[in-house]
Design a protein with these regions (language model features):
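N-terminal beta1-alpha1-beta2 submodule of the flavodoxin-like/Rossmannoid cofactor-binding fold
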Residues: 1-86, 90-109, 113, 176-193
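A generic structural signal for alpha->beta connector loops
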Residues: 32-34, 60, 123, 155-158
């Protein structure tokens, strides 16, 4: 199986989200699966313009904006699993992921043109990896619900969200429990594919 991972933390290599994502990826790859990772803070991704150019072609993204989303569209169309990996800021994902989510749902769901078309995402699966400062049930719950609705709309199977709490910059983030839970989450995901 193949995964497309959208990693979205401004802290890049120092990111707690990346630490968890790497455990997920190591487990995923150890099971013989492939993954392509995009670090969205290192890319150029403009927000959707709602121009609906994408709705004129029901077989391809056909987005009027040509930036790094072109490579992401291609990777997602070739993947079985989409992974959103973002810290939670203000109870939702970081801004580059939100821009990518908007572009994905419009360019790949052909529901908004003169004639209704298919979802090019149909049959794919999605999971998310997050870190947040609050307990996950209060810090990641709104993002989790947003993903459920995004997936239902796009006809994507939502496999769940892994959230780990960051207790503060003066406290080491990665614990054996977080590492074990991240590995178990990855195993659960590929068993449910």
């Amino acid at each position: 199986m193949r995964a497309c991972v959208l990693f979205v933390s401004p802290r890049r290599e120092a990111s707690n989200t990346l630490a968890v994502t790497n455990i997920f990826l190591n487990t995923w790859r150890a099971a013989g699966h492939r993954a392509e990772v995009f670090s969205l803070y290192d890319l150029s991704i403009a927000p959707c313009r709602a121009c609906r150019a994408c709705q004129t072609d029901h077989a391809a993204p056909n987005c009027a904006i040509h930036d790094d989303m072109d490579d992401i569209f291609e990777s997602i169309l070739q993947s079985d699993l989409i992974v959103f990996a973002s810290p939670i800021y203000s109870w939702y994902c970081t801004a580059p992921l939100k821009a990518a989510m908007d572009r994905l749902v419009y360019a790949l769901c052909k529901f908004y043109g003169e004639m209704r078309g298919p979802s090019l995402l149909e049959g794919k699966a999605l999971c998310a990896i997050t870190t947040c400062g609050y307990r996950p049930e209060q810090g990641a719950d709104l993002f989790d619900e947003g993903l459920r609705r995004w997936c239902k709309h796009a006809r994507v199977r939502y496999l769940g969200l892994f959230a780990a709490r960051h207790m503060g910059y003066d406290v080491p983030f990665m614990t054996p429990e977080i590492a074990e839970n991240a590995k178990a989450f990855a195993e659960k995901i590929f068993k449910n594919m």
